[in-house]
Amino acid sequence: MLNLVDIIRKNQEELKKLKVNNKDLKVLSFSMLSTIEQCMRQYKFNYIDRIETDSDNVYTYLGSLAHLLIEKLYRKEITNKEAVSKWLEKINSMVYFFVDYSKTEQYDKQIELKNKNRKYKNNYNMNMVRYFRNFKPIQYKDFLQEERVYIRLDKVFNLPFFRNYVFNGIVDFIGLNNDGSIDIIDYKTSTMYKGDKQILHSYQLILYAICLENMGFKINRIGWNFLKYARKVRRFKNGNTRLTNVERRTLKYNDEFEDCIVEIDYNVENKKKALKFIFDNVKLMFNIDRVKDKNTNLIPCNYNEFFCKNLCSFYNICNVSR
């Protein structure tokens, strides 16, 4: 049976050697690919100009905290009660807003946004506290957390153009089953994905699975664990069962529930779509890299008011803000 730790470590050492031996190597991440998919100008600001910004926001901050606490819970370094305590300590002392009311000058509007921020924070907090309070580790023969994997794109596409490109990423959780297959789980503190957003983010896990499959592992399942949600189980007298995804804060004390793990179909069709996602966006990167000295504000911008104002760290230096 394949040794999970040894094979992952060997893969990581190979990547280190590639970086040393090929100074032109471009190490791609899902974040880079999704950034250029969203906006080429944002990509240039971030990955070519390397403009320093405070890229943290309430979601990245609390997401990182949740990942850290889950790691410690799986390693039995903290108890459920301690995880709840640490979560509450951090969320109550953080400087980030769910809805930023601090820049609004109109008093009535500020009060409205302040109340909205309080509501979002309370709901989010109740969901996550219930997650940590009810945390139960999934049982595996072995597991790894927060491990880097990679694959050479010239081997994937069999094209010389990609010889200086590799895809890599850090997998939240890899679980080894008794039959030697593996599960890939990504923890999410966000709202559940739907539509195009679900399709886009599925590529991340599919690409991680391709990396691990290339190492010789058989993929059993891949999916997200949406931490704010639970899968409510309702059993009927006729033997039928109904499963409903609900926010954890809505659960009653006697409700039966399980983690809300949303699986992604890992099949040939979806693998092709994920690889096309890489192929198309690497071509965009190549074209932008060729004009790296060009004024970034002359690079095409995919303007979206909500995204630009709330999620893009470069809004204030981008000419769309003027």
Describe every region a protein language model picked out.
Residues 1-322:
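RecB-family 4Fe-4S metal-dependent nuclease core
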